[in-house]
C-alpha cells in the first residue's frame, strides 16, 4: 500500500478536493487525511470533519511546516486555475499552477513524500489525434495556458521521479461531472450545469456547439481511479504519470436526449462562448486508456445512462432541501 500514514490534500476546496478528502478519510481515517486550502471559508465542512490547515501553496515555508507538523508522506496537489479562467489571466494561471506543483515536488523530495497531481485532456492540443487519443502522442500544439501548464506538470513529475526518485503519479482526467460541487471555470462545465438547469427550470442554454464531443467522467469513477493508481504496485507502472483514463464521450445533444428520457419536456438551445468553443475544439473527442487498464486495472463503472439517473436524483434532492435555487 502506498499510503503509509499521513496524507495532505492541497487545494482541498476545489471540485476534486471537496470530494476526494471525505473519500480518502472514509478509507484511511479522518485524522490521517489533512485538508489544506487558501480559503478556510469554503472548507468549513472539511475542517469540521478532520484536520485542516489554511495554506497558500505558493508559501513554501508554511507548506513545509505543515508537512513536518503532521508527518505527511503523501501529497495530493490539486491547486489550479482551470482552462477558461486561465485564459483571462495567463500569467496568474502559470504562477499558480506551476508554482504550486514545483513547491509540492520540492517539498516531497526533501521530506520523502509521494505526490499525486492531476493532468487533463487539456494537455492535448489541436494537432493531437482527435479520436482514441493515444497515451503517448504529440503535445506541442496547446492553445491554452492551462494546457501548457498541464504538459509542463507531466514533464516535471517525470523529471522528479527520474532525477530524484520522488514517487510521482498522475492521470489525465476528462471533464468531471459531479452533483456535490458546482463547476469553477472549466470548458466542460456545461455537462454539470445542464443537470442543475434541467431540475431548476426544465431548460438549458449550452455554450458549446452541437456535435462537440469531449471525454467525460462521473466523479465517483474519478475518485476510485486516484485511489487505485496510488495503491498500484509501482513495478507495474511503465508510464507512472499522466495516464489517459476514459469513461464516456458525448456531445451536448446526447446528454440532452438522455435527460429527456426522465424529463420529457426538457429543452435546450445554444449560445456559444467562443473562448470555450475554441478550447473544446482543440481537445480530443475521446482518449485511449488501454495503458491504465493494463498497468493498474482501471475500469469505470458509470456511463452516460446510469450517471444521468444518479445526477438527476441527487440534484433534485439538493433542490428539494433548499441547498440550491
What are these regions (language model features)?
Residues 7-27:
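N-terminal Rossmann NAD(P)H-binding glycine-rich loop of SDR-like oxidoreductase domains
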Residues 98-104, 138, 149-157:
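Conserved catalytic Lys-bearing alpha helix of Rossmann-like short-chain dehydrogenase/reductases
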Residues 47-59:
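Rossmann-fold cofactor-recognition segment
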Residues 1-2, 252:
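Short, small-residue-biased leader/transition segments that mark boundaries at the very start
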Residues 207-209, 215-325:
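C-terminal substrate-binding subdomain of Rossmann-fold SDR/epimerase-dehydratase oxidoreductases
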Residues 158-213, 219-224:
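NAD(P)-dependent short-chain dehydrogenase/reductase
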Residues 77, 102-145:
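Conserved Rossmann-fold NAD(P)-dependent oxidoreductase catalytic core, especially the SDR/UDP-sugar
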Residues 57-96:
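NAD(P)H-binding glycine-rich loop region in Rossmannoid oxidoreductase-like domains
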Amino acid at each position: 500500500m502506498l499510503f503509509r500514514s499521513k496524507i495532505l490534500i492541497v487545494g482541498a476546496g476545489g471540485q476534486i478536493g471537496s470530494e476526494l478528502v471525505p473519500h480518502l478519510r472514509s478509507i484511511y481515517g479522518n485524522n490521517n487525511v489533512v485538508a489544506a486550502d487558501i480559503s478556510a471559508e469554503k472548507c468549513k465542512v472539511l475542517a469540521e470533519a478532520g484536520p485542516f490547515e489554511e495554506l497558500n501553496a505558493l508559501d513554501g515555508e508554511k507548506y513545509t511546516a505543515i508537512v513536518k507538523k503532521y508527518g505527511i508522506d503523501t501529497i495530493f496537489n490539486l491547486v489550479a486555475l482551470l482552462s477558461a479562467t486561465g485564459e483571462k489571466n495567463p500569467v496568474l494561471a502559470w504562477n499558480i499552477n506551476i508554482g504550486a506543483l514545483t513547491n509540492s515536488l520540492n517539498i516531497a523530495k526533501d521530506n520523502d513524500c509521494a505526490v499525486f497531481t492531476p493532468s487533463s485532456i487539456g494537455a492535448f492540443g489541436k494537432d493531437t489525434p482527435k479520436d482514441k487519443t493515444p497515451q503517448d502522442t504529440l503535445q506541442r500544439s496547446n492553445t491554452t495556458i492551462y494546457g501548457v501548464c498541464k504538459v509542463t506538470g507531466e514533464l516535471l513529475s517525470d523529471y522528479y521521479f527520474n532525477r530524484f526518485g520522488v514517487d510521482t503519479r498522475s492521470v489525465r482526467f476528462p471533464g468531471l461531472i459531479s452533483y456535490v460541487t458546482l463547476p469553477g471555470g472549466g470548458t466542460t462545465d456545461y455537462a454539470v450545469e445542464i443537470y442543475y438547469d434541467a431540475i431548476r427550470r426544465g431548460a438549458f442554454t449550452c455554450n458549446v456547439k452541437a456535435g462537440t464531443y469531449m471525454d467525460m467522467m462521473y466523479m465517483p469513477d474519478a475518485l476510485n481511479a486516484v485511489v487505485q493508481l496510488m495503491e498500484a504496485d509501482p513495478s507495474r507502472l511503465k508510464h507512472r504519470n499522466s495516464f489517459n483514463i476514459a469513461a464516456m464521450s458525448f456531445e451536448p445533444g446526447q446528454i440532452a436526449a438522455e435527460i429527456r428520457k426522465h424529463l420529457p419536456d426538457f429543452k435546450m438551445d445554444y449560445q456559444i462562448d467562443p473562448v470555450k468553443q475554441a478550447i473544446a475544439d482543440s481537445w480530443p473527442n475521446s482518449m485511449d486508456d488501454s495503458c491504465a487498464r493494463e498497468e493498474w486495472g482501471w475500469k469505470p463503472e458509470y456511463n452516460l445512462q446510469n450517471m444521468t439517473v444518479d445526477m438527476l436524483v441527487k440534484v433534485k434532492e439538493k433542490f428539494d432541501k433548499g441547498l440550491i435555487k
